[in-house]
Every structure is written in structure tokens, then in C-alpha cells.
Amino acid sequence: MSVEPHPAAQRFAAVVLAADRTGKDPITLHTGAACKAFAPVGGVPMIIRVLDTLKACNLISTVILCGPPESLHDRCPELKLRIASGQVTWLPNMDSPSRSADRGLSHIPLDTPVLLTTADHALLTPGIVRSFLQNALTMQCDAAVGAVSGQAIASSFPGCKRTIIRLRDGGFRGCNLYAFNPQGRALVGFWRQAEDLRKRPWRLIGQVLGFNAVLLYVFGLLTSQRALAAISEKSGVNIQLVMLDDPRAGIDVDKVEDLMLAEAILGRKTGSEGSTDPS
């Protein structure tokens, strides 16, 4: 990813999306937490796990948190303390993830590269973040998207049900990890346009990929590179895929089954290493 060559300029500002998408989020209902981001995983609120991970990564300079609502902060004293101390900059969330991301970006200097992730990434580790960003920095692109192979998830977590994008060159699972240079920020605006069409799926597919790419997908000929090239052409942003080796990168906590899996993975790691070190 093309950024200024000076090492200091290669530290990223992180934007974390932390708002509930619905008033009936299954994780919130199951755990009784004030919001999804506060739901405990391994006894620690998900949002605190993510913030701890970003703090431990030497490629992250600042953290901006979009949501949850300020009225809920008393329900997570550790988060409230970090906001009050200036460790984290909090912003009210907007009415959609893309608009929240856009608001977060507006508070970051244009010459600062950005990492975008989510508060429900409970298994995120400093090593995953570092690997993603280091790979992104070596690529000739404006935006990088993290992914793991469907096979890696199936092998590591048998029975785990994940949404896998199946293309000619394999199955892919997104990781909710995105990196942008200044030019790459335009991808968030493209994302917002796609969100506005979410109730019109075929028009959405046509706008995001284009007719030729859709035909290739239908006939099983679409590869990841062709898909990214189609999105790059439509958005005007040069996008590249960063394949990550750690299958935990593809596990976010959206459903109760995800929560149980994350708890099991954390328990397995603690038991095998005698430590909760997330590296």
C-alpha cells in the first residue's frame, strides 16, 4: 500500500465500529450486555479485547471508536476510563456502518493510513493486525482487504459455519480488516452507495461487480483477482487482497454459536499455553 516512506508515517490510525446494527442483536440478548460490544468473551468485554489488541500493536498510533452510544458507557467502566484518559477517541455512531466509518475517517489527517475493524472481532490478536498491516504496506494498492481461506477455517474449526465466498480459485472468508491510504478512503463512499442498495440485491451486485463479473460468477469462472479488479474499476480505488494464515482472523462474534466457538478457542489457547497472551 502506497504511503509516505518515513517510518513514522507508516503507523496507522485505527477506526473501530462498535454500534449495534439492530435493537435485537442475538449476542446482546443472550448475554444480557448493554450492547453487543460489551458482551463478555472469556470474561472480557469484546470491545476491550479489541482495544487491548490495537494498543499492543506497534503499527497503531491512535484509536477512534465509533459507538456505542454515550448513554451506555457507564455499563463498561474500563471503556469509560480509556475514553476519559484519552487512550481512545469516542465518536457517536451514525445510522449505518459505512457512515460511521466515514465519520471516523473525517477525524484522521489525510496523510495518515487507516486500519478499519469492528468491535466484535473478539479473537483479533496483535500478531494478526501486524501481519495484515505489514503485508498491506508491501502492496501496490490504495486499499487492502483481509481474508482467510475457507479451508483454513474448516480445518482448524471443524463444524464451524461461516459465510464463505466461493470463487474459482477457492473459498474466502473476510476478516473485517481493511487498510486505506488517502486515495483508498474513497472506498468507504462506494461502500455507502452499496449499503443504500442493500434491499435491491441484483442491482447491488450489478453496481458492485458489473455485468461481466456477475456472469463469470454464475458460470463458476470468477476468481478473486477478477472480482477485486471489477470492484476497483467501479470504485476507482486500487484494491488488493491480503491472505492471512491465522484462521482466527475469520471468526467474528455475530451469533450465539460464534460466541461459544470464541470461548472454546480462548479456553483451548489458555489451557495449552497457560497464558492469555494474545500475540
Predicted feature residues:
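Short phosphate-binding loop-to-helix
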Residues: 78-113, 123-124
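Active-site acidic Asp-centered loop
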Residues: 117-119
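Short catalytic helix/loop segments, enriched in acidic residues and glycine
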Residues: 31-49
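Short, conserved phosphate/pyrophosphate- and ester-handling motifs at nucleotide-, phospho-/glycolipid
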Residues: 255
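N-terminal nucleotide-binding beta1-loop-alpha1 segment
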Residues: 1-32
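A conserved acidic beta->alpha catalytic loop
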Residues: 67-73
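Conserved core of the sugar-phosphate nucleotidyltransferase
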Residues: 124-233, 244-248
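Short, acidic, metal-binding catalytic loop of nucleotide-sugar glycosyltransferases
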Residues: 53-60
